[in-house]
């Protein structure tokens, strides 16, 4: 018996339902993942900034300073410059210890400003002030100041505006520091650590650019997860009247491989939670579950993204390449010397130490 052809009305209904289901599913997907769209489509609507001119960085142990200066196209000074290190501090106590121990022989004055308010206008403890005993080794070189910005709980400042207010406050500390024309001032965050050999070049070589960005090896969660060389905001500035503290692009020249930038490199899970709600991108905490300690611990050991975000890239090639977790590295070579000398104390910053304490 011949099979009856499908009913024309049923076929038309099917043709209508299939696209409707597909469109509805797409809209539902976009609704739940709309925060990904700007990042997914960024290569279409945004252009990368002007590339830096990268200065090659020459260094090897026991190579003389005259030769190192010469290799960079600079000349040896008769005496070393003074170096000032200026940072706005939040809660990175362990990295600050690594920073100050590593840079102590080269820095004339450490300038540290601490606020009782986060970028998101939350009241915060003065973590440094509560832990000054950890930094007694640097107290003779330290100029510390507290800053209490005016905050209205009913109308808090936007996070990036508050960040700008706090960074501008560092300028008063610079003016009190005794800095003079021709000195070098490092402007960076606490987790952006120039290498000692970089500071040695800045101390002893004449001819360096007046504003030199520092290309830092970027790590996430610890030195077990190297990301790339994308960190550029730290700068070395030849001081002149009118030089102001900034954490943004100031020139087109960058010194290659000039140190380390370890983002979210904390000992305790609670420190991760604090930063997630305290820094300028706190709006990325879209759900309370993002702050769950077990979730954070899992992401740290996977090399994933705490905010479930797509990478901020300008090409689809880089976007796709960075959509996977950060590959682990077993190398602890070319890291800060103090870190290696105190590996037991800072095990959480080294390969194999991803498990954190919960308290």
Feature annotation, model-predicted:
Residues 192-308:
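Conserved catalytic core of nucleotide-sugar-dependent glycosyltransferases
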Residues 110, 142-146, 211-213:
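Conserved beta-strand scaffold positions in the cores of enzyme catalytic domains, especially
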Residues 1-86, 91-92, 106, 305-308, ...:
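Juxtamembrane luminal stem/stalk of type II transmembrane Golgi/ER carbohydrate-processing enzymes
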Residues 50-83, 116-188, 195-200, 323-339, ...:
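Active-site-proximal specificity loops/subdomain of glycosyltransferases
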